[in-house]
Structure formats: C-alpha cells, structure tokens
Amino acid sequence: ACVAFQAEGRQEVIRLKMPSEGTLVIPDLVRGEVTFAWADEQDHVIRRADGSCLYHLATVVDDHAFRISHVIRAEEHLSNTPRQLFIADALGYPRPEFAHLPFVAEPGSKNKLSKRKLQKYLKDPEFARLQAEGEWIAERMHRATDVETFNPVLVDFYQQIGFLPDAVLNYLLLLGWSLDDSTELFTREAMMEAFTLERVNKAPASFDPAKLQSFQEKWFQKLEEKKKVALCVPFLQQAGFAASPPDCNLAPRLNEILRAAGDRVKIAGDILRFEEFFVSDEALDYEEKPFAKRIHSLEVIDRLRRLSEQFQKVDCFDAAHCEATVRNFV
C-alpha cells in the first residue's frame, strides 16, 4: 500500500503509535485522579504531509522549552492529556502538573456559555436587562450595538460601558473558587495570596448578570471621588457632552453630580443618565405650546402645591433630604 501511495505521489504523515491496552491515571489538581483507557486512544497524526507539526506535538515541545511546570486550562482539554503525556514520556521530558478548570455556564444552566446562543440568553430577564443597559450607553456614545458583536458574553462589552476590570475579575474568581463562606471582595494582591487550585470547584458555575453587577457596584462605590470623575469623563466626551481636553469646570461639576447621584451611578457609563446637567439651557429644545398647556393644567398645579407643602416640612434642605421628599411624594 505504501509503495502504491508513493507511486501516486502521496506524501506520508507521521502517526503516534499509542498503547492499545492498560490505563493511564492522571493526577489532576482540580479533579483528583482521572483514569483513561489506552484502548480509547487513536494513533494520532503528529506531523502533516507538508512537514508541519500538529498541536499535540508542538505544545508538548513548546511547554518543555519554556520550562512550564503547571498546565492550567479549560476542562475540554482534559481528553488531550493522555496523548500529550505519552509524547512527553517518549521524548524523555518531565511531566508537568495538570489542572483542568470548569467552564462558565449559561444563566440557570450547566451548559457552556456561548456567543452562538445569544437569543436564548436574552430570554433571561437579568441578561436582557444588562444587554439593554449596555445598548443604551453605547448608543449615546454613537457606537454600534449589533447584538452579535456587542453583548454580555464578550469581555469588550463590559469595557465599553464602564465596568471596572477589578470587579469583573473578582466576579470570575468566585464563579469557580471560594476562600470561605463570607469573603467576597478581593484585591488582585489578595487574590494572588489566597488562591489555591485545590479550592477550585469541579462543576461549572452559571453566569449570573445580577451578581456581576452587584460586584461592579461595590467596587465602584469604593473608588475615590477623583477616580470616579476620571472614569466618567471619557463617556461624556464620546457622547459629545464634554470637550476634549475637558474645560477646567468639568471635574468640579461632575464631582458634585456624582455625590448627588450616589449609588445610582454603578458603572462609569451611567453618568450619561444625567446628561441634562451637561447641556446648556440654550441647547434644550422642546415645543413650548404643548409644554405650557401641560404645566398649567389644574392637576399639575395641585401636585406642585402639595409638593411645596412637603418641602416646607423639610428641616435639612440638602440634596439627600430633597430627593427623599420627592420620592416619598411620588
């Protein structure tokens, strides 16, 4: 057969002759001992007909060349491990330690999160709400919001609307690992000090948009006022509400708005929800006649009179008490 193939001009490939009997036990730092039967392994091609090497040979040689001691990767690569260890043994390389991590699962499911299932995820109320909030911010910055390239499955989504890297990292850390039953917030330094592979969960954890937003809110509120201002300025600039470079009055005004807004600004992009404070009165455009008709109606006048009476009862006339008065009235 080989002679006939050569006569046809075919180029040979090189296959790895695998054992056909026995088992291989892999000590995995996350999953414990994992057993594979050699009979389930094929004789894999390790060099193509054009002379190039395939992934399994290349990655083993590459890891050895760079003195890799630990191979930490997603669980779908677990099935690749037997052939890679067989290659390492054949080449006389020391075996690295392996740790196969669980994937991030869909909301309310144990299936792997995938950008190809967006329409399914958008039926989840929290996922849909996060998508809508992101689109609202992106549209005001004149950015494309095509759901295939702008959605909560992609890291760029969070970067574009103002999520903090530390908040996203903190959330991802606790998706598959925990220190104890109470500690939630970790700085990067604390993560590096506390993290061990032994406490990584074997099972995948579902992506929870509400929990991620909760981490973002906590991290944003921890920031100094100066840092919050610095994060919000680019969003105002891209939306056309601030000059580039910004004028000297922007930072003090923005600081006051952030103080008054309190926890209503959870991500930097939320500052665009207060866009009316960055538009001059002359730039406001509205139809005067319909507005005058509505504002002079007896119902509106009565409401304003009753609201005025509530304000007269306020002892401390500051932003917090005024807001509480209006909210209670409404």
Predicted features by range, described:
Residues R48, F66-H77, A105-N170, L175-D180, ...:
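Conserved phosphate-binding loops in nucleotide/dinucleotide-binding enzymes
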